[in-house]
């Protein structure tokens, strides 16, 4: 039988639910607060676990098929970290959205606000590495490990706890659509 830690056993049903849905904040765009670029601790990170459960620190999660995907420029204020030059909608989505859709999405998510006077602009540049498919097809495990070390160092530097990439999959299903992110033997 698996043993449940006393700290977990002591959680209320509400706190356990918060732990499972992540950093959802109904006062910060509702559902939009959990879709990409949703971290308040590391600007541009994909999301984080909740900060609302006492004695459980939040975990920051970043994605990116070619290294960490974080905002390059950002500022911090009392509400958290905010990207400069980006909206709450990930840039990769913008290419597929019409101008009216972008307008309403920015309206819904709070748009692209710049820093107030006196806020210091900060920078976080991440190393670009080849996508998972290219790394796997090199059959060079030492090189793959080196790329992992690079990303791991940057995760420590920027305060990211979990990297949501690359995945491991075979490319036999066309329904996936994100095959470029996977380690695989299939070209």
Residue ranges and their predicted role:
Residues 1-187:
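Glycoside hydrolase catalytic-domain context in secreted enzymes
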């Amino acid at each position: 039988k698996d043993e449940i830690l006393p700290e977990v056993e002591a959680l209320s049903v509400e706190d356990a639910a918060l732990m499972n849905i992540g950093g959802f904040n109904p006062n910060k765009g509702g559902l939009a607060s959990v879709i990409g670029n949703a971290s308040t601790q590391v600007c541009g990170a994909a999301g984080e676990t909740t900060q609302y459960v006492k004695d459980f620190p939040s975990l920051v999660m970043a994605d990116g098929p070619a290294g960490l995907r974080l905002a390059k420029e950002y500022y911090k204020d009392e509400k958290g970290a905010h990207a400069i030059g980006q909206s709450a909608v990930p840039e990769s989505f913008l290419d597929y959205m019409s101008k009216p859709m972008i307008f309403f999405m920015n309206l819904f998510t709070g748009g692209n606000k710049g820093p107030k006077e006196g806020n210091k602009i900060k920078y976080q540049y991440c190393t670009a590495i080849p996508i998972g498919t290219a790394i796997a097809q090199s059959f060079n495990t030492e090189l793959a490990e080196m790329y992992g070390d690079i990303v791991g160092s940057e995760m420590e530097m920027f305060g990211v706890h979990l990297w949501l990439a690359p995945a491991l999959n075979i490319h036999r299903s066309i329904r996936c659509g994100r095959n470029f992110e996977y380690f695989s033997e299939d070209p």
